[in-house]
């Protein structure tokens, strides 16, 4: 599918072109991706941005774990250290009992159901007792019960009837409404130990009370007990990556966080180890760029150390701190990981940058498909766009019938045990680079007498010594110009441990007349085989070529037919000493390599394989 594109070149020209098939493949291990993420973190201020106030709540509502456990009970007003009731209030029943008891001071329950006031010596049956404080006796129930009409005087040491049973019965010491019963002096609601009492739930020292400040439901057991949390130090994380075949990567960042804060009982110094884990999917956006996208992010806390009151009572707030940090750190650190991955995505996007190829053209890499993720490596397929400064794309192979299929990218060799990255460049791509140079005329050269000291004199006398008819036509020595042109694109053939460049050139021998008129003596076709070697300097692939052999064919001659073989040594020397240095000079600008994930190929091992050049680091 042809997709039009147009980008501005760094030179004055613009480069417009079309997408090609995959010509370059990059494989990287998890270590390369991990190093890229680590380098991004070190160079950016993403983690330093976390050194700030920790947002404990939003709109006054603290982070909590109420979705796990039930919310704390609601009290009447909650003003008195978490107590159930207002200041000075206790819970009573239908009378003004003391400390929550059901009956008045000094009253006991007799066996016949009547209430006896031990503060007085006279007794009255329940049916004649005045109700609610008007007499010494009153009924223990709403309806009158059958009672005694007469009660005798007690002998010395005698226990009144009903006292023993009343101690354990309703209203007794331990019975219902008694001192220790559910509604009595100690255990009843509002009693000493009961709910809302001194030690009861919501009481002065109970849950939510003074001691409840440090307990479940108290002030310190909620986030309100810790305020002013601020991250003061965040170490650069240790990054580890695990490849998830067909998905992406599993990212783990281990860091240490130092946090300061305040509590009701002193300042807090918190040190916590955090392991941030994220499942990251590798996708492609609509523009065709790969993107690392977080699917899930979690934080695992460990090694929490809390210094409170110079070491006092640290265990009381450990669970609270753990719960608070478990709630707030994911919302604080996971977005930072997302920012870091965004910067890594930007690095992936740098591949698409237009890079000058000398002053004559440019190279641009683009992604051709969704990267492949295996258990061993991440594979990126790249297109290469080689453009001329004049605006045309080099669509290799030029001059070939359109029905011929393009050469497919060969299979890459397995990665070695000590290999972290592998860049494979096809012969097709190298041919495109040389084709761009050929179309710009960079390989054409005019060689004149005296230009190269190692060459013999380029005159009619030198040529006439080999071709007598030249001497006959030009008895006086005249200077010659050897005009070498490359009319067709060179081709690159890669074989095992051998890179061959075939260049077809024409060599026109021109003589200069006294009146500056040039006359062609002959035109020779020269087929040359060049041996190429490769190296890496910086971020560029350097190509150096040397002449292997030449083959000549006489196309035209103005001095009659002659055996072109007699010129083979001279032509080969001209190509070796003049043409090859000129060609290596234009190749000296190097071929830009893809800039991706901070990979350094400067010390790469280079292997020439069948139709493939492989750089391994």
UniProtKB/Swiss-Prot annotation:
The main location is secreted
What gene codes for this chain? Answer: Bpifb4
GO cellular-component terms in the record? Answer: cytoplasm; extracellular region
Organism of this sequence: Mus musculus
The protein's location, in the record's own words, is: Secreted; Cytoplasm
Which keywords are on file for this protein? Answer: Cytoplasm, Disulfide bond, Glycoprotein, Secreted, Signal
Name the family.
Answer: Belongs to the BPI/LBP/Plunc superfamily. BPI/LBP family.
Question: Which N-terminal residues, if any, form the signal peptide?
Answer: 1-17
Taken from the UniProt record, the cysteine pairs bridged by disulfide bonds within this chain are 297-334
Which GO MF term does the entry hold, naming one?
A: lipid binding
Protein known as: BPI fold-containing family B member 4
Q: Does the entry feature the keyword Secreted, yes or no? A: yes
Entry keyword annotation includes Cell division:
no
Q: Which residues are glycosylated?
A: 275
Purpose: May have the capacity to recognize and bind specific classes of odorants. May act as a carrier molecule, transporting odorants across the mucus layer to access receptor sites. May serve as a primary defense mechanism by recognizing and removing potentially harmful odorants or pathogenic microorganisms from the mucosa or clearing excess odorant from mucus to enable new odorant stimuli to be received.
Q: Where is this region: Disordered?
A: 117-142
């Amino acid at each position: 599918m042809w997709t039009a594109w147009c980008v501005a070149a760094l030179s004055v020209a613009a480069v417009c072109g079309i997408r090609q098939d995959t010509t370059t493949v990059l494989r990287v291990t998890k270590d390369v991706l991990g190093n890229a993420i680590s380098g991004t973190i070190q160079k950016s201020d993403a983690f330093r941005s976390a050194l700030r106030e920790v947002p404990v709540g939003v709109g006054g509502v603290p982070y909590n774990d109420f979705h796990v456990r039930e919310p704390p009970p609601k009290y009447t007003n909650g003003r008195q250290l978490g107590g159930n009731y207002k200041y000075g209030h206790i819970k009573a029943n239908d009378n003004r009992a003391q400390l929550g008891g059901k009956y008045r001071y000094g009253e006991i329950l007799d066996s016949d159901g009547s209430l006896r006031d031990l503060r007085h010596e006279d007794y009255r049956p329940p049916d004649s007792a005045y109700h609610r404080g008007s007499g010494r006796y009153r009924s223990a129930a709403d309806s009158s019960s059958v009672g005694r009409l007469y009660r005798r005087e007690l002998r010395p040491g005698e226990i009144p009837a009903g006292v023993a049973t009343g101690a354990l019965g309703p209203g007794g010491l331990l019975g219902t409404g008694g001192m220790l019963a559910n509604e009595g002096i100690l255990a009843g609601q509002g009693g000493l130990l009961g709910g809302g009492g001194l030690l009861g739930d919501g009481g002065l020292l109970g849950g939510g009370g003074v001691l409840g400040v440090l307990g479940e439901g108290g002030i310190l057991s909620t986030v309100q007990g810790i305020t002013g949390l601020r991250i003061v130090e965040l170490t650069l994380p240790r990054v580890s990556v695990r490849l998830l075949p067909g998905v992406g990567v599993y990212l783990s960042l281990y860091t240490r966080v130092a946090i300061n804060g305040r509590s009701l009982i002193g300042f807090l110094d918190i040190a916590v180890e955090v392991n941030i884990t994220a499942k990251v999917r590798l996708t492609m956006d609509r523009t065709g760029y790969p993107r690392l996208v977080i699917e899930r992010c979690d934080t695992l806390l460990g090694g929490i150390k809390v210094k409170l009151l110079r070491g006092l009572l640290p265990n009381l707030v450990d669970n609270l701190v753990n719960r608070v940090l478990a709630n707030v750190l994911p919302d604080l650190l996971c977005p930072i990981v997302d920012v870091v991955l965004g910067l890594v995505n930007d690095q992936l996007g740098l591949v698409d940058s237009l890079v000058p190829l000398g002053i004559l053209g440019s190279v641009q890499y683009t992604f051709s498909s969704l990267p492949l993720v295996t258990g061993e490596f991440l594979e990126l397929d790249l297109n290469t766009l080689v453009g001329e400064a004049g605006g045309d794309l080099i669509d290799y192979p030029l001059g070939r019938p359109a029905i011929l299929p393009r050469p497919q990218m060969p299979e890459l060799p397995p990665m070695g045990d000590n290999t972290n990255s592998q860049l494979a460049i096809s012969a097709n791509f190298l041919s495109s680079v040389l084709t761009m140079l050929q179309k710009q005329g960079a390989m054409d050269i005019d060689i004149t007498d005296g230009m190269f000291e190692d060459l013999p004199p380029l005159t009619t006398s030198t040529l006439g010594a080999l071709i007598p008819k030249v001497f006959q036509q030009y008895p006086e020595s005249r200077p010659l110009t050897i005009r070498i042109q490359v009319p067709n694109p060179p081709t690159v053939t890669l074989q095992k441990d051998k890179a061959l460049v075939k260049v077809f050139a024409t060599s026109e021998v021109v003589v200069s007349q006294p009146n500056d008129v040039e006359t062609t003596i002959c035109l020779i076709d020269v087929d040359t085989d060049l041996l190429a070697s490769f190296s890496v300097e910086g971020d560029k692939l350097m190509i150096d070529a040397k002449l292997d052999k030449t083959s000549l064919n006489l196309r035209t001659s103005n001095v009659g037919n002659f055996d072109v073989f007699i010129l083979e040594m001279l032509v080969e020397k001209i190509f070796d000493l003049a043409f090859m240095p000129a060609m290596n000079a234009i190749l000296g600008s190097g071929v830009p390599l893809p800039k991706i994930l901070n990979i350094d190929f400067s010390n790469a091992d280079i292997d020439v394989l069948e139709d493939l050049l492989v750089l391994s680091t």
